[in-house]
Amino acid sequence: MCGIVGLFLKDSRLEPQLGQLLSDMLITMTDRGPDSAGLAIYGSATEGKAKVTIQSAKPEIDFADLERDLAEAGVPARVAVKSTHAVVAIAAARLADVRAVLAAIRPDVRIMGAGDSVEIYKEVGLPKDVVARFDVRSMGGSHGIGHTRMATESAVTTLGAHPFSTGSDQCLVHNGSLSNHNNLRRELIREGIAFETQNDTEVAAAYLTAEMAKGKDLGQALTGALDDLDGFFTFVVGTKSGFGVVRDPIACKPAVMAETDRYVAFGSEYRALVNLPDIESARIWEPEPATVYFWDHQKAA
């Protein structure tokens, strides 16, 4: 059992409140998963710039002088430290370079996510503690997703926490269990995708990344997942401009959605949504089995 939440803002006036709203939603789901928690926040992008969220078990060592060491390695960057995580801002053209340099000069650092706009924060612990550790309430953005985990098939670690990201500005949270993830992992490794964990959710994230690399949009990739992924699952997925939800054909994992003129919201239970603005006038529904729900800022523009 896990708790997942998501919030896609249609009204830009709500964007400064994204971190506050999403934090409250996730904390409400604490009793569905007290082992670890995480959030992905899609903030504003800066043309020509990219950012990488990194994590370290020894931040006082790994993050010390990191800006200097990156510059000496030929990759100028700005580093903003937030507890065990840091956001490394670089020129977009240097994204592949910074990955290679980090692996060389900080081998114990792990990449949580990268792209133009996404920042990913996750740790072992209760949602309220993770939210406070990274000051999530102060963060603004256009959309975000969150997860609180009760571990069932892999270790309780920071790397095993959700969201999982395997592509630029792409991430996924999951409630359920996949039965064919080992076979699918082997196929994706042959396609060149690297994995950090044995978690089935990382396989689902990598599957979507691989499908979107073939030219599919998020909605099309989620439709393909209904045929290619076996097991029980509810996915909430984020891309740079999009937000998607899909449940398996049996839909045994709980889910509820709300939509107003100002936002679209997802929660494992309705209580995750009760404090959202104007929730009393929202359209509330349970997502149908084997049905893809997809919203995109670019298509709405």
Swiss-Prot record:
Active site as annotated: C2
PROSITE patterns recorded for this chain? Answer: GATASE_TYPE_2
- InterPro entries cross-referenced by the UniProt entry: GATase_2_dom, Ntn_hydrolases_N
**TM segment ranges:** none
User: Cross-referenced SUPFAM superfamilies, in alphabetical order?
Assistant: N-terminal nucleophile aminohydrolases (Ntn hydrolases) (SSF56235)
What Gene3D superfamilies does the entry give?
Answer: Glutamine Phosphoribosylpyrophosphate, subunit 1, domain 1
Q: Which parts of the sequence belong to the Glutamine amidotransferase type-2 domain?
A: 2-298
Its keywords, alphabetically, are:
Glutamine amidotransferase, Transferase
The protein's Enzyme Commission number: 2.4.2.-
- What GO annotations for molecular function exist for this entry? transferase activity
This one is known as Glutamine amidotransferase-like protein GlxB
The organism encoding this protein is Rhizobium meliloti (strain 1021)
**The gene coding this protein:** glxB
